[in-house]
Amino acid sequence: PLYDRTQRAGSPTLIKAILHRVDPPLYGHLQSLQLEWTPILLRWHRLLYMQEFTEATILELWDTLFAIDPTLQLVPYISAAILLSQRDKLVQSEYIDAMQFLMHLPDLNAPRQLVEHAMQLSQTPSASTGAFIARAYEQHPPPEPAESKMESAKHLLRELTAGILTQDGHGQSDWSPRR
């Protein structure tokens, strides 16, 4: 599991664990700033982002969240998605700027999309998911690790060879270099 189930769902430890897994460079930068996560997360989670966004945004966010997850297990993943949606600003920030920014976030354009991204993070907490979410908010994703590039190349090669080596009805390959 991504975190010890005994951890509180909104704890800084869980948010850091998610971020470490989905965007190690952003995680590293925020760690180097030694951010005070407790006041940020208290504000975000205790009031379910009510002080962060406009009333219309909150209503749409809550409607979507409660429809998908009435247990509120997605809340820490929503917070991680918020961080990814603001990645460019955060990686360029120093401590004071980052704290002020996180305490006064810009309004969301697509609250439903944020909840959907949080669900993706909870189901597949990986660097590729983090990069996908960052791109969805027009942020620059972190550089892809060399291993990941190799895995992408292997996957593409498997797809290409599967298309070439399709089987006919008798289990024989229908591919020939003479065709």
Positions of PLM-derived features:
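Helix-rich, well-folded core regions that mediate interactions or catalysis
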Residues: 1-179
